[in-house]
Amino acid sequence: MVATYVTLEDPVKAVVDLINNNWDGTYTSAVGGTKPTIDESWDLGKRNLKNGDIIRCYEISGGHDILGIGKGLDKHTSTITIDIATAVSRSRLRALYQGVIHIIHAAHSKSAGSALNSDYASIKLLSRTDQSDKLRRWYRYVLNCEITSYEVVN
């Protein structure tokens, strides 16, 4: 018997779509009236922060855990990094961060305007690192979040 598996959407694309689809006028006005560039890291290439704020997403790890004996569930988790950067100010960085956090919390509680892609069961925040460089006026937070899907193993 051949096992069949569902093709899941790329977890990075799912996180980018979640943030992009829920970034509305409230967040845009909180960060000075300009929506940041939100995309997958490999699609953005090099960008100058002086031209606008950037939110890059990329996957740093993934894993599978078979739940049960024999036929069961494959719990797939991916750790996605959300890299938030601005050259404006620390308060602008905090506003961008608050927007991203609010969207992820809303998705986790299933109250986001646009839901997390249906391939994935949940998204949760893991950590935040401040990687700002005050000498260069480059303000940056790096967030890690975990996105989880479940798949039946035949």
Q: Where are the regions a protein language model picked out?
A:
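Small/polar-rich, solvent-exposed N-terminal microdomains that initiate assembly or binding
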Residues: 1-70, 107-113
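Conserved acidic
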Residues: 7, 11, 92, 137
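A broad, low-specificity signal marking well-ordered, structured residues that form hydrophobic/aromatic
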Residues: 53-56, 80, 123, 143
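"Short basic amphipathic alpha-helical interaction patches in structured regions
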Residues: 71-73, 95-101
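Oligomerization/assembly interface segments of phage tail-like spikes and tubes
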Residues: 72-89, 139-150
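Short, conserved charged micro-motifs
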Residues: 89-95
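Acidic-leaning, charged glycine-interspersed low-complexity segments
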Residues: 101-154
